[in-house]
Regions:
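Conserved active-site segment immediately N-terminal to the catalytic lysine
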Residues: 185-196, 206
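Active-site C-terminal subdomain of aminotransferase-like
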Residues: 25, 196-286
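PLP-dependent enzyme catalytic core of the Aspartate aminotransferase-like
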Residues: 2, 11, 16, 340, ...
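Conserved N-terminal alpha-helix of the aminotransferase class I/II PLP-enzyme fold
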Residues: 38-87, 108-112
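Conserved PLP-binding catalytic core of the aspartate aminotransferase-like
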Residues: 296-326
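N-terminal "arm"/small-domain region of PLP-dependent enzymes with the aminotransferase-like
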Residues: 1-45
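PLP-dependent aminotransferase-like
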Residues: 82-83, 87-142
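Active-site phosphate-binding strand-loop segment of PLP-dependent enzymes
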Residues: 126-179, 190
């Protein structure tokens, strides 16, 4: 470690120094679950029972975690949320979408539908980073989408069906919110996410919880002459998922870690337990920032401050990049802000795998570093 960077006393450090916003902290037990399956599951066919059973554990576990209503299905595919945006443009938007955008990731799906030559230009309702627009509807659209949690800015937006949206699917990007924020799945038609945030696994897989209306839309569009690459085909994903399979070979270790994390969550009380845990962690972070003379929550509206991704602005006299660098040199990693936001801030992951007490210790470390830096 450079002599110019302060050393953080051991008694201040968190038990685990991983605070990334995805990939996020992986529990040792998840790695052990992969090791335990080294010869029984790893390196075996994804069309046979051992791997299909793991996919089934993921699907059944998510059904329990989110208390799925009758007729909702857990659908899996390869490629992560980025691939799902393309799949949704091909297979869920009939003609025109409405997007709420308030950061880097909530804007990405809007860019996809805007660029799709077979769709009309979307309606885009925007808000500045750090704030969020009110969910709304438009009679001209057949899908309304927004992010449950905007990972780039630390803004969360509750999930509820906008008034007048009866003819539109409600599609929620829950990439960093699923498993850590409250949701009533019946308020959504498509609740999609990836496993590298709250579910403490690796990326490269997408999950979409689909309502009967969404499944009908998939079948409806599939019956038209709209071309779609097989890899992005939602009918193919729906059919394979019903068999506890994916269209092409999945990352089996990712699924093993994913399944273990879901079961860990359910064993402790399910989504209610997860939400209470992230509420505990985030209250520790925001209470500290509000009491600090150099730190301020970036999101000014308390109701929009994320329970899973905390963004904290630092006073201009303090170099946040130097603080993050010092933390990293002391084994406390991934507190840097989202690169494109360009703010003097820290960004802290507070997913269920992260111990609330470690968040408290992190704040003490930040105080120490700021006090020691020239």
């Amino acid at each position: 470690m450079s002599d110019q960077l302060p050393t953080i006393p051991a008694d201040l450090k968190p038990a685990d120094g991983r605070f990334g916003c995805g990939p996020s902290k992986v529990r040792p037990e998840q790695i052990a679950a992969v090791s335990d399956a080294a010869t029984s599951v790893m390196g075996t066919s994804h069309r046979q029972a051992p791997v299909k059973d793991v996919v089934g554990r993921v699907r059944d576990g998510l059904s329990s975690l989110f208390s799925l209503p009758e007729g909702y299905e857990v659908v899996l595919g390869n490629g992560g949320t980025t691939a799902f945006w393309d799949a949704a443009a091909f297979g869920l938007v009939r003609e025109k979408a409405l997007h709420l955008t308030y950061g880097e990731f909530s804007s990405k799906f809007a860019k996809v539908t805007a660029g799709a030559p077979f769709l009309q230009d979307p309606v885009v309702v925007s808000a500045d980073p750090g704030s969020a627009p009110e969910p709304t509807s438009d009679p001209s659209v057949d899908l309304i989408g927004w992010a449950h949690n905007e990972t780039s800015t630390g803004v969360m937006l509750p999930v509820s069906r906008p008034a007048g949206s009866d003819n539109a699917l409600v599609a929620i990007d829950a990439t960093s919110g699923a498993g850590g924020l409250p949701v009533d799945i019946s308020d959504t038609d498509v609740y999609y996410f990836a496993p590298q945030k709250c579910f403490a696994s690796d990326g490269g897989v997408w999950v979409s919880i689909m309502s009967p209306a969404a499944l009908e839309r998939v079948a409806e569009i599939a019956a038209t002459d709209r071309w779609c690459p097989d890899f992005l085909s939602l009918p193919t994903a729906v059919d394979n998922s019903a068999k506890n399979q994916t269209y092409n070979t999945p990352a089996v270790a990712t699924l093993l870690m994913f399944a273990d994390q879901i079961e860990w969550m359910n064993e402790r009380g399910g989504l209610d337990w997860c939400v209470s845990r992230t509420a505990d962690s985030s209250s520790r972070l925001y209470d500290w920032a509000e009491a600090s003379d150099f730190a301020t929550p970036f999101v000014t509206e308390p109701a929009h401050r994320s329970q899973v991704v905390g963004t904290i602005d630092l006073d201009e006299r303090i170099d946040a990049a130097k603080v993050a660098k010092t933390l990293r040199a002391n084994g406390i990693v991934d507190t840097e802000p989202y690169r494109k936001l360009g703010r003097n801030q820290l960004r802290i992951g507070m997913f269920p795998a992260i111990e609330p007490e470690d968040v408290t210790q992190l704040t003490r470390c930040i105080d120490h570093v700021v006090g020691e830096l020239p």
